[in-house]
Amino acid sequence: MANEVYANNMEISCKAANGKSIAAFPDVCFTPPQAPPTPLGVPIPYPNTGLSKDTTKGTRTIRITRKEVMLKNKSYYKTSYGDEPGRAPKKGIVTSKIKGKVYFTSWSMNVKFESKNVVRHLDLTTHNHASFPGNTPVWPYLDQATVDAGGGPCSNEVKKEKKDCADFKPHGSKDACAGLGAGKPSGKKTSNEADRLADKVAARKCLTARRCALQPYKPNSCCPQQTAHHLIEASALHDKGRGGKGSVPLKGISNYSENKAPCVCAEGVNQNVGTHGLMHTFQSAAAAKSRSGTLQLSNGSSISAKKTTYGTAKRQSMAAMGKVFPQSKCSKECLSAQLDNYHKQCGINARTPIKAVETGQTDVTAATQAIKTRNARLGATRSRVR
C-alpha cells in the first residue's frame, strides 16, 4: 500500500513500500549450454525486477512506516530478480553477476534526509550490479501511484504501448529495433539515410507508440540507430553550452543535468538531418519570433539574448512533436506531465525565463513538405498533438 509521504509530488521510496523497478531489459547473461561455438554459454537478455522490500543501507534515524528510506548514492535493493537462468560461470556479460543489486540513478534535487537526497517513485534505476555500472539500461521506478493503477495523464499512451508492443521486449520476445540498420545514419545534409530510417520507424506501431515515452539523454531506451533530442534545449537554460564546465545556469535553475533531462527518440545524428533536424526546424522557427532581453544568471551577472519562458518553449516543443511525429499521437497532457516532472525539480516553472534557442535548418516550408511526403508514403493522416 502507499505510504503517502511525498517529495516533489512523487512518493518517497522506502522499505515499507510496494515499489518495483519492473522488467528492466535487457540484462544480458551467459546461459548454458557451454559448447562450441559459444563456450562461455549463450548470451541471452533477461527482464529484471527489483523490489522496495530489499532496500539496504537506507536512513538510520528517519523512518517511513517504521522502516528505512532510500538515499542517493548510498542505498540499493540488495537483489534483482529475473536473470536466474543465466548461471553459466561468466554470468552477467558486464558484471559477471546474476541477481545483482539495483541502484538508483536519479533522485529528488531538493528534499534530503540525513543530508542525502531521497529517492522517489519513478526515479530511474540500473539492475544486476556487482559494482557500478550495472548490466541493464535505466528503467522507470514504479510505486503505488497513478501509473501503477493505469491512470494519470499518460494512461492512453501506456495502454497503446502495451497493445502495440505486445510481441516485443519486455512484453514479448522480439526486438522492436531489429532491421533498422547496422548503426546510426549519416549526418551529412546530402545523405537521405536519416530519412529512410525515419520511414522505417514511422511504419512500426510499437516504435511510434514508444515515442510518447520520453527518455533521459543518456542512458536511454531509444533504438541504437536513433538519437535522443531534448524537447527543452539544454542550452536554453545556461549562458553558454549545455551545463558542462564553463556553463552558468540561469537564475533560479539548479541541479540540471542534460543527461537526465527529457528527450524524444528521433532519427538523425545532428540538428540538420532526419526527424531530429525537423524538430530543430520547427522549434527554432518558433524561437526566432522571440524578442531580445536581459536574462539573470545564477552567479549574479546577466546576459542579453532572445528570451522566452519554459511554458512557451514547452508548448512549442509539443507542437513540433505533433507535426514531426503524427503517427505517435502523443497527448499534450502526457508530454507536459513528463517534461514538468523533471524540470520542476530544477526550480523551473511555466513562467521561468529561459533563452529562445535557434539551431539547425530554418526552412519551415521545406520541413512541412518533407512530412507530407512521408505521410503520403506511409498512408498516414497528419495530426497534431491533441
From Swiss-Prot:
Keyword Hydrolase: yes
Catalysed conversion reaction: Endonucleolytic cleavage to 5'-phosphodinucleotide and 5'-phosphooligonucleotide end-products
A GO MF label: deoxyribonuclease I activity
Gene Ontology BP term (one): protein secretion by the type VI secretion system
Highest taxon, organism lineage: Bacteria
EC number(s) on file: 3.1.21.1
Swiss-Prot/TrEMBL keywords: Hydrolase, Virulence
Keyword Hydrolase in annotation: yes
Assembly notes: Interacts with Tsi7.
Functional description taken from the UniProt entry: Type VI secretion exported toxin that via to its DNase activity induces growth arrest and ultimately DNA degradation within target cell. The activity is initially neutralized by a cognate immunity protein Tsi7.
Protein name as it appears in the record: DNase toxin Tse7
Species per Swiss-Prot/TrEMBL record: Pseudomonas aeruginosa (strain ATCC 15692 / DSM 22644 / CIP 104116 / JCM 14847 / LMG 12228 / 1C / PRS 101 / PAO1)
